[in-house]
């Protein structure tokens, strides 16, 4: 009986994938695509303009931004590319 219970617990953990992390893009502006694994459940893409032109920042989570910065948050892997 204990063996059956232990087997069910292991199968449940494997099926639920309790260690799931989200994959978000983290390259800046027009740099080559890079990704990172995140503990957060969302990715973001911030866009703004300055004296160098349009700037883009990508990363994990969904931060608050200042006025004049466009923020897009999403909830699937690499959705912020």
Swiss-Prot record:
Mark the transmembrane ranges: none
Keyword presence, Signal = yes
UniProt signal peptide: 1-21
The subcellular localization recorded is: Secreted
**Recorded GO CC terms:** extracellular region
Which Pfam families did the record assign?
Toxin_cobra-type (PF21947)
Q: Which family does it belong to?
A: Belongs to the three-finger toxin family. Short-chain subfamily. Type I alpha-neurotoxin sub-subfamily.
Write out the function statement from the record: Binds to muscle nicotinic acetylcholine receptor (nAChR) and inhibit acetylcholine from binding to the receptor, thereby impairing neuromuscular transmission.
What is this protein called in UniProt? Short neurotoxin SN160
Q: Which organism is it from?
A: Hydrophis hardwickii (Hardwick's spine-bellied seasnake)
